[in-house]
Amino acid sequence: MDLLDKVMGEMGSKPGSTAKKPATSASSTPRTNVWGTAKKPSSQQQPPKPLFTTPGSQQGSLGGRIPKREHTDRTGPDPKRKPLGGLSVPDSFNNFGTFRVQMNAWNLDISKMDERISRIMFRATLVHTDGRRFELSLGVSAFSGDVNRQQRRQAQCLLFRAWFKRNPELFKGMTDPAIAAYDAAETIYVGCSFFDVELTEHVCHLTEADFSPQEWKIVSLISRRSGSTFEIRIKTNPPIYTRGPNALTLENRSELTRIIEAITDQCLHNEKFLLYSSGTFPTKGGDIASPDEVTLIKSGFVKTTKIVDRDGVPDAIMTVDTTKSPFYKDTSLLKFFTAKMDQLTNSGGGPRGHNGGRERRDGGGNSRKYDDRRSPRDGEIDYDERTVSHYQRQFQDERISDGMLNTLKQSLKGLDCQPIHLKDSKANRSIMIDEIHTGTADSVTFEQKLPDGEMKLTSITEYYLQRYNYRLKFPHLPLVTSKRAKCYDFYPMELMSILPGQRIKQSHMTVDIQSYMTGKMSSLPDQHIKQSKLVLTEYLKLGDQPANRQMDAFRVSLKSIQPIVTNAHWLSPPDMKFANNQLYSLNPTRGVRFQTNGKFVMPARVKSVTIINYDKEFNRNVDMFAEGLAKHCSEQGMKFDSRPNSWKKVNLGSSDRRGTKVEIEEAIRNGVTIVFGIIAEKRPDMHDILKYFEEKLGQQTIQISSETADKFMRDHGGKQTIDNVIRKLNPKCGGTNFLIDVPESVGHRVVCNNSAEMRAKLYAKTQFIGFEMSHTGARTRFDIQKVMFDGDPTVVGVAYSLKHSAQLGGFSYFQESRLHKLTNLQEKMQICLNAYEQSSSYLPETVVVYRVGSGEGDYPQIVNEVNEMKLAARKKKHGYNPKFLVICTQRNSHIRVFPEHINERGKSMEQNVKSGTCVDVPGASHGYEEFILCCQTPLIGTVKPTKYTIIVNDCRWSKNEIMNVTYHLAFAHQVSYAPPAIPNVSYAAQNLAKRGHNNYKTHTKLVDMNDYSYRIKEKHEEIISSEEVDDILMRDFIETVSNDLNAMTINGRNFWA
């Protein structure tokens, strides 16, 4: 069995069906302080107290944190200062309980490393025979994409090894590259035992003779030209310290983290693994599912390391998390084309035949003189020729719509392919598809220069026949194009083969793929731990497996194969306040999903309702639905100014966009509170249209399926579904379902020492704001040559609380793609503050911001953003200076938290930690306080906690208060009466970012985006040749579209539900 099949194959199995319970035993040593107390180093340093332990071991570990890589910005907080939230006062909130948890993290022993590690700058330059030079570490613009990046990484590692072997005199005669760690970019790390010289510059040239034939085959892929050479330049940089007084400085600690990462990565830098920022995947094996004919789901892992401060001594933690990702299969492009067309037409394909049933060749008896090449795999065909012919006829007859072609174009864009007629070429001839062209091989012509120098108009079909002696079998299919600097190359699909190792982008995932990525292949905690351990030992070669040569050379080892174990807090949930001051208290021992008959605390008042029915089978039931809706809403206290028989009810076709817009515009003129859309499917295209017009025109809408609407007409059953609809409807109409309150006691346990004081301090005159980003694929740009905007912008979702923390408003806006800095903050903060002032009649004295982040590299940037927020507040009103609390939320952190002992046969809720589990990470060396919190209760799979980092704390709330407020806010989500993974403002901001992205996609379908492009180009015609024009056009384009699409956003209302 393949290793990844063994590691990840349990993901779909029954809990505990084949696995054995891991041997675990708790430490018998009593501990009063699990984290210990940080001390300054002294000449007579006592052995540090164990801050973590591992099951079955009493070995001391390290102090305390498991964050990601440190940022090197010197403007960050002093690592030795007192953490921002660390006030020496009694905790305001008491835990409901404490218990032991294990993490997906392991201790590394770095105490035996050389005290100094030399850093060598390694710069490889590709030199063509014509003198052109390309520095590989900077990347080559024409050499992008998943496949090319993997080839470049492997080639650079081979360049490093060849260079190392050419220069043994630099390493005290050593010829084994294992003594050095190369980061596959431009830095080499070597212990001072093997390298202790200072070089200003050392130059070496490598040619084909320095590599074996197999190595050169890989290296030559990045040159694309024969005769290329490589110039290697090195020089030394200041060393890095593994211990001593300089080891824990901000810059040294950051670089030491990179060293440990590079050392542990060395065994992965080969053809056996695909390394991406999102994870590492084996090239062979690890296939856990195949959603369709041309895609598969592969399992992999993510490894991160961190240097932490243990009583003044640097120590290391390694985190290993399992992951999965969809990939394209190694197939012909024609098979991919037919599979996508089958999905788009929902027909299951054209007429079926067998592989041998090919069409008769043109040319009759002369066919033997032509190359009978049939597929990318040396004569084997992987597509159905009759199906291809079927779609070719549909394309000829113009029965393939522009919408289908556009969807197909999006699926093909960015795909790396190998032209099979060039597969034997020594140079790398792979191409990246830019788009699908409506022209065919017969219709597209170009001027070809003949041997006698004359020019002749030649079709693509004629060219391949004359140049490659190949007659195209499907000359009437659309062509694919690949963009070069100043022109496009055209290729027939039948001559394209998809290269392996390419991930599928989120925007290209089908419903089936998304289903496999979420629920179907979820692993339980017991399986997750076993998988992580196997990755640790089998792939990373740690533990008792065969020696890891790089780890041995640097004298780095794993302290124990058992993961880190520590104490966790069990936080108490808030009270929920319904109508008539009715309080609903939760007992965490019974779960946090609450069922209550309490009426809405602030029921909405509805002026009128418009119902648009898109299901012709439901026409006769619309009146009954309206009566049932009014009845159930009235039971919750909602008021209607008009009777259901006076509501406007209209029947439209399931794809009538124009009619939908007309009805919504009329609803706005008539002051209608809400527009209902009843559709047969549960997730139709009309849903996106309704939500698009909701934000663009400014009218609240809600879409339900006919099945859901039918439940409103019954006397019995469907209560949960009805409740969910009404809970969503009430906030959209301006009401509030319930409020959250600070609890005094839970289950006869006092959980807050002074609830009235905490209520006044934490919630009165406090506004909570959430920022979320939705990034797309490649970076956006304005293509001047095509006069069009290429790519999708990043969408920022912003949610803000009003007078009460459970009352939310929000909006979204666009900015440059892949830009992680929040733009236009002063303007956006003004919107938030204005909404709070309008609902409360005063401005907030405290502003709490939950800002999404991806790691410690974001911290200095967030500090700068806070300064913009403060400037916006000062501009709001003279003398206005609210206190800011800014928390970075890292939802994609690879930290996991499990119970110390797991019942391997238990269900997901039994194997996971409970809602409210909080690991209090003590003051870390970077000076920011952190905690890890699990709010949700997973019904399947393994819970994914969120890491919170306190960046700014002007209001001086204690960490205990911040942890509890964060947990309480998760319960303020109004629709599902159970907490999601993050606070309500973050959850709402996340939904707003998704909604904004979907609205942009819908906008591109309904509006001719070229109109924007030409307007923007004409506006900046006078600077069209300047170097800054691309950025200027791109920013102007995004701002124009953002203002057009979001101008009528409904303020101060939960419209996105």
Swiss-Prot record:
Top-rank taxon: Eukaryota
Start and end residues of each Piwi domain: 677-1001
Keyword field: Cytoplasm, Nucleus, RNA-mediated gene silencing
Bias-annotated ranges (Low complexity): 17-30
Biased composition (Basic and acidic residues): 67-81, 356-388
Region annotation (Disordered) ranges: 1-89, 344-388
Its job: Transports small interfering RNAs (siRNAs) from the cytoplasm to the nucleus. Required for RNA interference (RNAi) in nuclei. Required for exogenous RNAi-induced H3K27 methylation.
Name assigned to this protein: Nuclear RNAi defective-3 protein
Organism per entry: Caenorhabditis elegans
